[in-house]
């Protein structure tokens, strides 16, 4: 079983032959509330993925116009290049939803950030493009309250890792 604050609290209480304390139960309640917010955010982001990805790609093209005028496989000067850009932005968004469901940065760290520098150098991709895309998603996802806070925490984590 993987260790989490909840499993550690249960293990500690069990080893001491006691029920969970009020404080431990409050932590558990808070984690479940956070999980519900994360799941709601993941669902909303997934439902709006197409419009968020397209808007984010256009934000990248606006801020970095050379991406649509520079020829080559790694730029958005062709329909194929634009499709690759949208695919990559969609991947970033998908990983954010995985983190929301998992309740931690593990999916971001393991599926995205591990080896990302190598990929970006190999394919001449600029992290600043994805930072701009993520900023657009954060500003336009339409979430509110705890769901917004949960989503923004993972988007900010990713932006900081790319910056």
From Swiss-Prot:
InterPro entries: Globin-like_sf (IPR009050), Phycobilisome_asu/bsu (IPR012128), Phycobilisome_asu/bsu_sf (IPR038719), Phycocyanin_a (IPR006246). It is found in: Cellular thylakoid membrane. (2R,3E)-phycocyanobilin binds at residue 85. Contains one covalently linked bilin chromophore. The keyword Membrane applies. It is a peripheral membrane protein. Its main location: membrane. One of its GO terms (cellular component) is phycobilisome. It comes from the Bacteria. The keyword Glycoprotein does not apply. GO terms for biological process: photosynthesis. Keywords: Antenna complex, Bile pigment, Chromophore, Electron transport, Membrane, Photosynthesis, Phycobilisome, Thylakoid, Transport. Heterodimer of an alpha and a beta subunit, which further assembles into trimers and the trimers into hexamers. NCBIfam families: phycocy_alpha. Light-harvesting photosynthetic bile pigment-protein from the phycobiliprotein complex (phycobilisome, PBS). Phycocyanin is the major phycobiliprotein in the PBS rod. Belongs to the phycobiliprotein family. PANTHER family: C-PHYCOCYANIN ALPHA SUBUNIT, PHYCOBILISOME 32.1 KDA LINKER POLYPEPTIDE, PHYCOCYANIN-ASSOCIATED, ROD 2-RELATED. This is C-phycocyanin-2 alpha subunit. The gene is cpcA2.
């Amino acid at each position: 079983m993987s260790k989490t604050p909840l499993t550690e609290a249960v293990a500690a209480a069990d080893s001491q032959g006691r029920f969970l304390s009020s404080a431990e139960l409050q932590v558990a309640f808070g984690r479940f509330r956070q999980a519900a917010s994360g799941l709601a955010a993941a669902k909303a982001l997934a439902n709006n993925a197409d419009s968020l990805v397209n808007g984010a790609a256009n934000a990248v093209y606006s801020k970095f116009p050379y991406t649509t005028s520079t020829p080559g496989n790694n730029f958005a000067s062709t329909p194929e290049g634009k499709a690759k850009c949208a695919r990559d932005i969609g991947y970033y968004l998908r990983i954010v939803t995985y983190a929301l469901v998992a309740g931690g940065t593990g999916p971001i760290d393991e599926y995205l950030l591990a080896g990302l520098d190598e990929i970006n150098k190999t394919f001449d991709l600029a992290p600043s493009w994805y930072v701009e895309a993520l900023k657009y998603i954060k500003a336009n996802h339409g979430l509110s309250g705890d769901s917004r806070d949960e989503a923004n925490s993972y988007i900010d984590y990713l932006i900081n890792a790319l910056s």
